[in-house]
Amino acid sequence: MAELTIRPEEIRDALDNFVQSYQPDAASREEVGTVSVAGDGIAKVEGLPSAMANELLKFEDGTLGLALNLEEREIGAIVLGEFSGIEEGQPVQRTGEVLSVGVGEGYLGRVVDPLGNPIDGLGEIATESRRALELQAPGVMVRKSVHEPMQTGYKAVDAMVPIGRGQRQLIIGDRQTGKTALAVDTIINQRDNWRSGDVNKQVRCIYVAIGQKGSTIASVRGALEEAGALEYTTIVAAPASDPAGFKYLAPYTGSAIGQHWMYDGKHVLIIFDDLSKQADAYRAVSLLLRRPPGREAYPGDVFYLHSRLLERCAKLSDEMGAGSMTGLPIVETKANDVSAFIPTNVISITDGQCFLESDLFNAGQRPALNVGISVSRVGGSAQHKAMKQVSGRLRVDLAQFRELEAFAAFGSDLDAASKASLERGKRMVELLKQPQYAPFPMEEQVVSVWAGTTGKMDDVPVEDIRRFEAELLEFLRRERKDLLTSIAEGGKMSDDTLQSVADAIAAFKQQFETSDGKLLGEG
């Protein structure tokens, strides 16, 4: 029988190998905290010394919380969901994760909550990956100047305050002045681009509803579906009934979904409706977490709340795929006061604003755009060349009309030139009126604006202007389709093109009958 011998060196080597290759069990150690205060959508948690800012926490019933305040003895967290089941003394676990949302093409045509969960009853969403809500905005070196137009379909906006892809254009005004209608019509106006199948033309749209009535969100969804625009739109809904934490997070969820497409080389339009309610929700959360209040009781970082959100909208350089995300934030004012805290903050962050005025709205001017204080700082370089060519005089003419109108109200005698300017101004104001859910293609806008600014409608009675425009465009679509196509596909209009437009208008006038039964051609 062979002698069995074990040398000490072999034992030592075996122990060394075992120690080096030892893998401990996964659940070796975890931190568990305790809820000390709960209520009103927030929770104070003791006993999680290693928790990080914006880390997700998990409560006993599976509800998630977001760590916002990291204090010496406790953590202040907002509860993401129903907080009635969270009580003092319950255990809380760290997850080691930050808040993220699923992204991908599966979100098109769907309605989701601020955590990315579907709430439209159409089943689960197939996601491609997950994206953190708090991601750095694109840096200066990966951006490109705005140079492509983003058509809204509104003559007043596309002619005087043009918007480019990658721009942030604020829509501001009192309640019930048509802010949401302008945003929804801009989404609907992207329909033909989407159906063209051209990736460079297609725009994916995201509508973020913050603190809106549930019925309002449902009506927006219905309008988009009826217009055939829901197929390329995602709705992120945080209605008024949702906790303040959801209303605070909803815009970041929408921008995370949009950023995924932007970095993929696609074009995105995102609407935040509206950021006043997000600021109110953030103020409520901050006051509940005992953060020191500042002006109008908003916390000190409320500017950063909006700046870090809106800076994510950008036009990326060709090296980054040339994608873009255009932002249309909406802010509600009180009594047309644009000098309040939140409006001035957002005005200073954005690249321009469309100011909608309740007096104009009530006077029947829709969209109720106040041209005097509405401005687009970067959109001019993105405006279609034909539109730029015909709309140059429009803003000046309207400003002169407003001055003359105020002057004429005193009953003073006006010279012939002033009277002519006043009459043309009345027709231009009438021409810029537009019904909801009826956006105009760019080439038809160009024809309408050119006809108005060059005096081709001066002999049309004011009450017939809109009917004249509608029938003229129908005549052009039927008889001179080639002319509209050449305007749409070309750049600046040549003298020959302008002459062709003038001839077409003259030919149409021969058959247009005014409301008093008179043919314009006879005049």
Swiss-Prot record:
Keywords: ATP synthesis, ATP-binding, Cell membrane, CF(1), Hydrogen ion transport, Ion transport, Membrane, Nucleotide-binding, Translocase, Transport. It is a peripheral membrane protein. It holds the Pfam family ATP-synt_ab_C. ATP binds at residues 173-180. It comes from the Bacteria. Coiled coil: none annotated. Its main location: membrane. GO terms for molecular function: ADP binding; ATP binding; proton-transporting ATP synthase activity, rotational mechanism. It catalyses: ATP + H2O + 4 H(+)(in) = ADP + phosphate + 5 H(+)(out). The record marks 374 as: Required for activity. The keyword Cell membrane applies. GO terms for cellular component: plasma membrane; proton-transporting ATP synthase complex. It is found in: Cell membrane. F-type ATPases have 2 components, CF(1) - the catalytic core - and CF(0) - the membrane proton channel. CF(1) has five subunits: alpha(3), beta(3), gamma(1), delta(1), epsilon(1). CF(0) has three main subunits: a(1), b(2) and c(9-12). The alpha and beta chains form an alternating ring which encloses part of the gamma chain. CF(1) is attached to CF(0) by a central stalk formed by the gamma and epsilon chains, while a peripheral stalk is formed by the delta and b chains. Belongs to the ATPase alpha/beta chains family. Produces ATP from ADP in the presence of a proton gradient across the membrane. The alpha chain is a regulatory subunit. This is ATP synthase subunit alpha. The gene is atpA.
